[in-house]
From Swiss-Prot:
The modification N6-methyllysine is found at residue 47. Pfam families: Histone. The modification N6-succinyllysine is found at residue 35. The modification N6-lactoyllysine is found at residues 6, 12, 16-17, 21, 24, 44, 86. Belongs to the histone H2B family. The modification N6-butyryllysine is found at residues 6, 21. This is Putative histone H2B type 2-C.
Amino acid sequence: MPEPAKFAPAPKKGSKKAVTKAQKKDGKKRKRSRKESYSIYVYKVLKRVHPDTGIWCKAMGIMNSFLNDIFERIAGEASRLAHYNKRSTITSRRSRRPCACCCPASWPSTPCPRAPRRSPSTPAPSESLPGPGARSLPPSLPPRVAGCFVSKGSFQGHLTTSVKESFLCCQSQLMFLASRLVNFRRAHNTKHR
């Protein structure tokens, strides 16, 4: 008696076996591209303010695009400020002015931690970042702690990593945003019930 043909059962429509990762022709898996975002910082601040509250992925995308937009506005305003004063760099003390111009009126009054001052024994931020991906200032310009290197020829502001870190250290602003987002979410949830 001939044996019946054995077929593998077809995967169900919604099963995970049917969905496979995209592969190249030679059989290697594609690497996932890395995307930088502020989502981990927003999440940390949210958990510090409201430990029992979570955030949706779409809301995190909104917060991420908001922070990118604010950061670009501050960089552009800092570039204009340096151009008006005929300077190639701005110090950490002068970086509060662009923040006051770009942010809402209530933000500059909230307490903001000052940038740490560099002692002679600690290296400058451009010297302390090892690796090929580290950005450093041109050798003709002195490195500034929490400063901003702005090319005079263009209005594009190239911020050093110390400015980015000091921007992320302003947790009072992020806490304010996280609490506003939580209040909006609570109000939105109560409307639809």
